[in-house]
Amino acid sequence: MGIKNLNTLIESNSLNGINKRHLSSFSGKILAIDTNVYLYKYLYGKSNHIDGMFFMINKFKKFNITPIFILDGKPPDEKTDTIKNRRLIKDRLEEKLSLLKIEIKALETDMEIQEIQKEIDVIEKKIIYVNRNVIDKTKTLFDLMGVVYIEADCEAEHYCSKLCNLDIVDGVVSEDMDTIACGSKLVIRNFTNRDDNVESYYLQDILYDLNLTNKSFIDLCILLGNDYNHR
């Protein structure tokens, strides 16, 4: 549910809650992976999602980390309006994309073609969607590489947090700050295949620095605004 400005607030007010750590420090740990976040990241990038996931899995193996990949399930009813708005925006962008692809065929100069192509490239990234084909290919890769994955009955970040709260996993790997709001005691962010260093968010240290209880922290996240509560 993307908490607005939460990361900025934590960075500004919690000296102990965020630490830069090398992945080797998580050797022997079990981590839940908010998979769809990284599928979108790899689809947006220059490499395809299979390449991205392949290198991600190998990096975990390199540092003796056991990943459990969690795939998105059905979003909650409270998110219906947000999903409808996103779909409307996507439909408008697809319509604009179709018109631009027609327009570019009629252009003559390289400069004009390059300008329109840039606009096309931007829109194509904005309408990227993790569809069933992407999920099926990713699951096939997981099977081939012998890693565990779960298709959640809810949004992946919530399921990851549940596993963390139940001490089934030691932490959550995600770029979404809502995993912290959901109570994950450890959230690992800024994971890339190019760098072995990550940022680790420790919920108890964050609460201590902010002088908040867990309930007060959740109330703060609601006030900041999210996919259910627009501010």
Please annotate each region the language model reported.
Residues 1-100:
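Non-catalytic, usually N-terminal nucleic-acid engagement modules in DNA/RNA processing proteins
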Residues 84-231:
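Extended two-metal-dependent nuclease catalytic cores across DNA- and RNA-processing enzymes
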